[in-house]
């Protein structure tokens, strides 16, 4: 029988419910259990695919092409298990299905209501696709008390009532704010959060308390008394310097064993060798390398969450700290770039959409190429790299991307040529996007082939434009190597400038497949080049 664990949050948002769910999944996995982690988001968007990165953060793409919340990236990175479209749902997707079914007459003329019809869809999502798993961990987005989340809390209340405690566990994550003037952690917000949860019929079984300093036994006992939870099941979650220290911190707090004890499951030893190795590597990371991220969504670093993590994974691999330097691409000019990129060891241009900030980004790419600084362009970053090369190396001064709808020589063109600009609307925007994992063939003896140690790979994509193959010959005459292609050879996947120290652009998103214990080969090689550049300068 599968066991369900629901992770909810209170007091404030962004407490780390996703990291808690991912950490618990990893810890249970380390004991030999099969675990699936899912995210239920209360917002009305069908998925985050069309949301502004400044509003939502990164859109995490799964192998099967689902555009999901960045928390699924945490789930994958911690467990090593690929997420899929069945691991994420939103209120928007629920209402979309509900209204479609209502129009088709599937409700047989009854009055369609939040209870039971919306809650039934939520329950079906949670209770479906459970075969082969010992635990299903469901993270409920937002905080208790949010009006958008009420149907989700009602649905999991009903599930808990049906399955009873033998197969259902509620974990509630709260904040214990530290008031410096009083020199104490405040428990009152946690009391109110638990009270709000109980008011809708859910009594938390485990209370995870986030705090910036250690929680004393006296404070734990007080929380236990006031929240009516045994002190054994009040788990401290103290701030950590690095997110990869969180799972072991939870293990040291006994979270995994408490879950097993609650379910009356025999406690087995944990195999955590690879995580202890990560911790040791982090402790041994005394040297650092400076990487500039040329960002158009610089106001919210979570817009590049997987890129940041993938760089850290490569840093862990080499026992180096990655010192990220965030550069607002809109503010870059020929006049200030020397100052902005002073003492930089590597330049990375991540994915993005739209014309804004492209001028400054192209200036940064030119700076990397002409100064022989290690460069890594991802998706849009690769596309802009080809435009920079066309304009400044080959001499095609009017080189443009078709995405911006301007006159010029289209170095970057639509994947689907039959899709006119006027047809690209919110309604069919998904149909124009190449989403998910696709195979890619590599050319032997190239940077890419040497990095992957294979000629056949699979990587995840999220784009609707590609390199115009009509210009391949002229690019090759100027020293550019096309080292990766889609299986039908229609889409250029990787470009390289082998005469430079390390200059690589990829059409896909390698950051989505990087793990802390298995850094992505391209990020490994990029950081290696940056380390060597640092030593030479």
From Swiss-Prot:
Protein name, per record: CTP synthase
Modulation of this protein's activity: Allosterically activated by GTP, when glutamine is the substrate; GTP has no effect on the reaction when ammonia is the substrate. The allosteric effector GTP functions by stabilizing the protein conformation that binds the tetrahedral intermediate(s) formed during glutamine hydrolysis. Inhibited by the product CTP, via allosteric rather than competitive inhibition.
Residues reported to bind UTP: 13, 222
Q: Where does Mg(2+) bind?
A: 71, 139
Q: Which residues are listed for ATP binding in this entry?
A: 14-19, 71
Instruction: Give the record's GO biological process terms.
Output: 'de novo' CTP biosynthetic process; pyrimidine nucleobase biosynthetic process
**Physiological role:** Catalyzes the ATP-dependent amination of UTP to CTP with either L-glutamine or ammonia as the source of nitrogen. Regulates intracellular CTP levels through interactions with the four ribonucleotide triphosphates.
Q: Which PROSITE patterns would you find in this protein's record?
A: GATASE_TYPE_1 (PS51273)
Which one of the record's GO molecular function terms can you name? metal ion binding
